[in-house]
């Protein structure tokens, strides 16, 4: 994939993610459903779509063979499915329910800054000037958003801030953890299985509702 294509896909993904937040906010005002239900339905429907794409690309058969040869890979898929996919979506929708889509999206997009800090600690090196600038701008932007420039008050509910930061942190995890899985599985198969696992993990909670 070319650098231009990668940048284009990242921009498209970010735009669609923000649009889904706006749609979720509208959904909450028009229905009695709660974030955990929306998350589960979204995961199951997305999983079905990605299974079709995996079948179309030939990755479904290869993925099943890999799991038969090494069933322990299901543990890694479960970790990514729950921590890297399910929680990032659930916390994002919870942030929107507690606050609004705009604030949740902006706070959640501190994930690149979190990744820079993680990699700096992981590789024991100082961030570059550009990376440092990214962290400073991200933190300053969130500070202005949540305080409105007044340190003595919050313009965004604390619950929204917490859920949004959880979403950002788990999104960072989702970008780092599955690198080794992408070497083993087709990307469509990986997403299909992990989204299915994430949806199943929510069943005990949604059945109680």
Task: For each feature predicted by the language model, list its residue ranges.
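C-terminal transmembrane-helix exit sites in multi-pass transporters
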Residues: 49, 54, 111-136
């Amino acid at each position: 994939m070319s650098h231009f294509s990668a940048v284009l896909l990242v921009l498209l993904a970010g735009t669609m993610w923000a649009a889904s937040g706006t749609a979720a906010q509208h959904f909450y005002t028009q229905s009695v459903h709660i974030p955990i239900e929306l998350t589960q339905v979204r995961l199951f429907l997305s999983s079905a779509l990605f299974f079709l794409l995996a079948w179309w690309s030939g990755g479904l058969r290869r993925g099943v063979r890999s799991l038969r040869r090494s069933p322990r890979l299901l543990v890694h898929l479960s970790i990514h499915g729950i921590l890297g996919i399910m929680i990032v979506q659930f916390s994002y929708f919870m942030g929107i329910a507690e606050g609004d889509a705009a604030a949740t999206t902006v706070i959640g997009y501190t994930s690149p800054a979190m990744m820079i800090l993680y990699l700096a600690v992981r590789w024991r090196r100082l961030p570059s000037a550009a990376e440092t600038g990214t962290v400073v701008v991200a933190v300053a932007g969130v500070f202005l958003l949540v305080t409105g420039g007044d340190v003595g008050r919050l313009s965004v509910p604390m619950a929204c801030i917490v859920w949004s930061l959880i979403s950002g942190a788990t999104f960072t995890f989702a970008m780092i953890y599955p690198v080794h899985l992408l070497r083993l599985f087709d990307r469509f198969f990986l997403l299909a299985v992990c989204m299915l696992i994430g949806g199943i993990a929510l069943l005990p909670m949604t059945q109680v509702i």
